[in-house]
Amino acid sequence: MTTKINKIGIFGKPNNKNLYEIIEKIFIVVENIDPKIHMFVEKSTAECSSIKSKMFISKLSVNIETVENLKNSIDLAVILGGDGTLLGIARQVASAGVYVLGINQGKLGFTTDLDVNDLQHNLGSLLRGEGIVEKRSMFDVRVLRKKNKTEEALDIFNAPAFNDAVVSRGAISHMVELDVFIDNSYLQTIRGDGLIVCTPTGSTAYALSVNGPIIHPNLEALALVPVAPQAL
């Protein structure tokens, strides 16, 4: 990793009030490596940890901003939590090309695999330019709706997906029937409880629980995984 990190944003799991100690450790590591780095803490994370704007942690001043403001002003997002926390933040900062680093505070971490006890070594190495950037695929999800065949479709939902997108039967008791197209070419009709479209990262999440394939993170691929399909 050759990009110089000048601004770091810290994001925590919502409503987690036990993050001050680890945030303090991060500040100490950063101060030891490069005290000129500007440190930011996401607003709700700061509130839960009783951190005030312009206060000092170690010898570094704290800046507090919302996620929306931070994504366009930081180089690195340090996320404290499990995979769910990382997924939520990654989706919000992806459009700005921010590097994401996960420190596991949950029970299981496929993407937040950095141990809090190894911060001095691992975070320090990254800040010295010795880190390796691992790129992960994402895709855009759009939901179009029209009242009849002649009416123009309206775009009612649009969002990036880091893990997966799921079309499901919801609360209805019967199966759904889905016509699947790839690049406007018909593939097949699936009858069942739903369909998961997942990235390589998402292949170890919901898709894995319904016997989907595990895809290597470096592959540029999407998996289509039926949920409880009606098939012989």
Enumerate the predicted regions with their spans.
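ATP/NTP phosphate-donor binding region
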Residues: M1-L76, N117-I132, V143-E151, I156-N158
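Redox-cofactor binding/interface segments in oxidoreductases and associated redox assembly factors
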Residues: I10, I79, V197
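Short glycine-rich anion-binding loops that position phosphate/pyrophosphate groups of nucleotides
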Residues: N15, D83-T85, L108, T201-S203
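Short glycine/serine/threonine-rich phosphate/pyrophosphate-binding segments
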Residues: L19, G84-A90, T204-S209
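N-terminal glycine-rich phosphate/adenylate-binding segment common to multiple enzyme folds
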Residues: K71-L76, L80, T85-G88
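Gly/Ser-rich helix-loop-strand patches that form or flank binding pockets
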Residues: G88, Q92-G106, F110
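Catalytic core of DAGKc-family lipid kinases
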Residues: K107-D193
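Gly/Ser/Thr-rich active-site loops/lids in small-molecule metabolic enzymes
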Residues: S185-L232
